[in-house]
A protein has these predicted regions:
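Zn-dependent metallo-beta-lactamase
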Residues: 1-10, 15-19, 101-108, 208-215, ...
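Pre-active-site segment of Zn-dependent metallo-hydrolases
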Residues: 3-42, 47-54, 74-78, 110-122, ...
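Beta-strand-turn-beta hairpins that frame and shape the catalytic cleft
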Residues: 3-9, 92-102, 133-140, 232-233
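Active-site neighborhood of phospho(di)ester-bond hydrolases with catalytic His/Asp-centered motifs
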Residues: 10-13, 33-41, 61-64, 140-144, ...
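Active-site environment of divalent metal-dependent phosphoester hydrolases
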Residues: 18, 43-47, 67-70, 91-94, ...
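Glycine/small-residue-rich loop that forms an oxyanion/phosphate-binding "nest" at active or ligand-binding sites
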Residues: 49-55, 61-91, 100-112
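Binuclear metal-ion centers of metallo-dependent hydrolases, dominated by the metallo-beta-lactamase
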Residues: 72-96, 180, 184-233
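Active-site-proximal loop/helix segments of hydrolase catalytic cores
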Residues: 113-185
Length: 233
């Protein structure tokens, strides 16, 4: 995400994932990143965050427990993970002179921080969703990995969500039907499906998600993004 002021935010940056053929190339070329936002500690969401943080000096934005675990267990630079950029559910961080507001909201999922040595997961607190609001710009709701839950309806009481990034893959998160119901609870202008197709187990598809939105009479626009695609809003 690039703000109107030119600042760069990454959310769950797994550039070297199996479906991004240019991932290693993009990772090597990455230079300017201001903040890395991480929703929970699973390896497919922490992704390349530590490497990028060390390389670019990007500050880590995460819940207090996850931030501490990423510093102690994964080696994220401690000077880039302080109280300025750590918080918890219901709290809002004011970044870049209030140009960016980040609010932590719940997600229903696991959160253990995993290492490459097959050791047991390390406590990483609770998983989160993120609301990212840009000054004089759109507000995004990134659900993180989650199931549907009724408190999603509270999001729209405090935030007008323009774009909802919603997991649809099934198996480890909600699938298309439950994701469509989540969209109805939040009522965003645009819904962008995510967290599907990376592994065989993630069987949910954008087409199925679109059909479920139609069944529910959703007024939200469905926007399906290709890997590596950029959109301007």
């Amino acid at each position: 995400m690039v703000t109107p002021g030119g600042n760069v935010l990454l959310i769950d940056p797994w550039l070297t994932n199996p479906v991004f053929e240019k991932g290693k190339e993009e990772l090597a070329a990455l230079k300017d990143v201001d903040f890395i936002l991480v929703t929970h500690g699973h390896s497919d969401h922490v992704g390349n965050a530590v490497e990028i943080g060390k390389k670019t000096g990007a500050k880590l934005v995460a819940t207090f427990d996850l931030s501490a675990a990423m510093v102690t267990a994964l080696g994220y630079p401690s000077e880039l993970a302080d109280t300025e950029t750590t918080g918890h559910f219901g709290g809002t961080l004011n970044l870049l002179g209030d140009e960016v507001l980040v609010t932590f909201v719940p997600a229903w999922h696991g959160a253990g921080v995993t290492k490459d040595d097959n050791s047991p997961p390390i406590y990483g607190g609770n998983p989160s969703g993120l609301i990212v609001a840009l000054r004089n710009g759109p507000a995004f709701y990134h659900t993180g990995d989650t199931d549907l839950f009724s408190d999603m309806a509270l999001v729209s009481r405090f935030h007008k969500i323009d774009i909802m990034l919603v997991c649809i893959g099934d198996h480890f998160t909600m699938g298309p039907a439950r994701a469509a119901e989540a969209v109805n609870l939040v009522g965003p202008g645009i819904a962008i499906p995510m967290h599907y197709g990376t592994f065989p187990a993630l069987t949910g598809t954008p087409d199925a998600f679109g059909e479920e939105l139609k069944k529910r009479g959703a007024k939200t626009e469905l926007r399906v993004m290709n890997v590596g695609e950029t959109i301007t809003v």
